[in-house]
Regions:
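Helix-loop-strand module that forms the ligand-binding subsite of alpha/beta enzymes
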Residues: 1-81
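Glycine-rich phosphate/pyrophosphate-binding loop and the adjoining helix
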Residues: 75-137
Length: 137
């Protein structure tokens, strides 16, 4: 997979945020993707001679602004070793269709459903535009 990514014109990464971080699967890919380019030299940090654009998208149950620090941390490293990064966070997501079924009383199911209907379509469109713009560049 790493060789296919090296030959690609761009890379789109996406993950839910679990316990304040990206999923274990994406974290494993991220580590292998970055580690292959580390030089351990002060004068040249990366062996990557062909940078590609990256889009990093996360979803979570908390408001999107809570994911800003997480995204910035990954963005900085990806930009240093893979290429320029654009990010998008979709927060306060609808986890299940029926919160009552699970007795999850800490969530306001109606607010989450309303957000999914009013805000999420715009976020989906924004994600689409990020990918479309990457292709144009």
């Amino acid at each position: 997979m790493l060789e296919k990514i090296r030959r690609a014109d761009g890379l789109i990464l996406g993950s839910p945020v679990y316990l304040g971080d990206i999923s274990a699967g994406l974290r494993a890919l991220y580590e292998r993707l970055v580690f292959q380019y580390i030089t351990y030299k002060t004068e040249v940090r990366s062996y990557n001679e062909r940078k590609i654009p990256v889009v990093l998208i996360v979803t979570s149950n908390v408001p999107a602004e809570y994911d800003a620090e997480l995204l910035n941390r990954y963005k900085g490293t990806l930009e240093a070793f893979v290429g320029p990064v654009q990010t998008l966070a979709s927060g306060n997501t609808l986890q299940v269709s029926s919160y009552e079924r699970y007795n999850w009383t800490m969530f306001n199911a109606e607010e989450k459903k309303a957000r999914r209907e009013s805000v999420f379509p715009g976020e989906r469109q924004a994600a689409f535009r990020l990918g479309a713009n990457m292709i144009k560049e």
